[in-house]
A protein has these predicted regions:
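N-terminal Rossmann-like dinucleotide-binding module
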Residues: 1-45
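Short, Asp-centered acidic motifs that coordinate Mg2+ and/or phosphate
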Residues: 32, 64-65
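Short glycine/serine/threonine/alanine-rich loop segments
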Residues: 47-48, 87
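Short acidic-hydrophobic, aromatic-tinged amphipathic segments that line or gate anion-handling sites
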Residues: 49-53
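Receiver (REC) domain switch-region micro-motif
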Residues: 57, 66
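Alpha-helix C-terminal capping/helix-to-coil transition sites in glycosyltransferase folds
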Residues: 60-62
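Beta-strand-loop-alpha-helix segment that lines the small-molecule cofactor/substrate pocket
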Residues: 65, 71-72, 76-97
Length: 97
């Protein structure tokens, strides 16, 4: 079974840590990336769907797992929204402040 993963952000951690790991792991598929203003991810991951908001991405029924790698003050709300949307969630530390 392949797990469709969505990154909530393509900042430093998304670009340097999360996306490369997900893209190389045989059980994960880098399915979607949220970039609010830019489209930097498209050059590196052209098959990933691009969303402009986390809420828009959460509406996609194909997303299985959401990596919440956004600014700390958004972790709680995005994780809660993803769980309520029926997604599995991985949250970067710290979970909240």
């Amino acid at each position: 079974m392949t797990i469709n993963v969505a990154l909530a952000s393509f900042g430093m951690s998304g670009r340097v840590f999360h996306a490369p790991f997900i893209a190389q792991h045989p059980q994960y598929h880098l399915y979607a990336i949220v970039e609010r203003h830019r489209s930097d991810s498209h050059a590196l991951y052209p098959d990933a769907k691009l969303y402009r908001s986390v809420n828009e991405m959460l509406q996609d029924p194909a997303v299985d797992l959401v990596v919440v790698n956004t600014p700390v003050q958004t972790h709680y709300q995005y994780a809660k929204d993803a769980l309520l949307a029926g997604k599995h969630v991985l949250v970067e530390k710290p979970f909240d402040t």
